[in-house]
């Protein structure tokens, strides 16, 4: 980029950074990218992991650095914030749509409702991303990553993950 770079231009660049574990989504889609501000000539980029200790965060930081440096932007710092903790409520509707297209069931309830269900032992229904059936069951609370659970659809006989 030439000339003065503003916050909106940096946000546009960062909106293209893909999540390394789910490359169909950007870090903005997932709500990992929390904020970009300009303070004293330095862009402060705030990110929040989907889970504390998420192994993808270092790759995400490196990808952010690469995107900005390729555009000639070196006046930035990346700040990882774990409080407040990430919530699926931060995901964009576009991100949820992309998850489903990718074959992962998007979160179907708010984080608050999900926590209430965990406390009370009440299970929430998860819609199959392949056939849209609600005739599904949890097979494991953890999928390929800590932020996903493994389910099985009794209608189309497909295993699938749910983003939790």
Predicted feature residues:
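Domain-level signature for proteins that mediate thiol-based redox and metal-cofactor handling
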Residues: 1-164
